[in-house]
């Protein structure tokens, strides 16, 4: 299968750059599956995971806090405020932050910041999904 170049950068550094055969991400209008030769596109992406597959079939997961995805026929670029490899996520920290976000939503249900609190919970759930998917991929390699 034909490969293309994928670059994932955060505000702090370049997280990944290399040849891949496919990329999956969540755009603002739904799921995106990207292969070499994809039609050019620029779209915002939601907080969640970017999953990509190397030419040998190995998959990797990166959590992104949202950002932009640019697709050219042989180059895909993800620009995110925060990007963390699934293998670098800490389950205990994620679960603690998720619990705190849930408690804040319950405690401040009538608060004007409810939308912001819900967005925080959504990000923690996306991190947890990235962590769990990475764990599953690691177990399948064994």
UniProtKB/Swiss-Prot annotation:
It comes from the Bacteria. It is found in: Cell inner membrane. Keywords: ATP synthesis, Cell inner membrane, Cell membrane, CF(1), Hydrogen ion transport, Ion transport, Membrane, Transport. Disulfide bonds: none annotated. It is a peripheral membrane protein. One of its GO terms (molecular function) is proton-transporting ATP synthase activity, rotational mechanism. It holds the Pfam family ATP-synt_DE_N. One of its GO terms (cellular component) is proton-transporting ATP synthase complex. The keyword Cell membrane applies. Its main location: membrane. Belongs to the ATPase epsilon chain family. Produces ATP from ADP in the presence of a proton gradient across the membrane. F-type ATPases have 2 components, CF(1) - the catalytic core - and CF(0) - the membrane proton channel. CF(1) has five subunits: alpha(3), beta(3), gamma(1), delta(1), epsilon(1). CF(0) has three main subunits: a, b and c. This is ATP synthase epsilon chain.
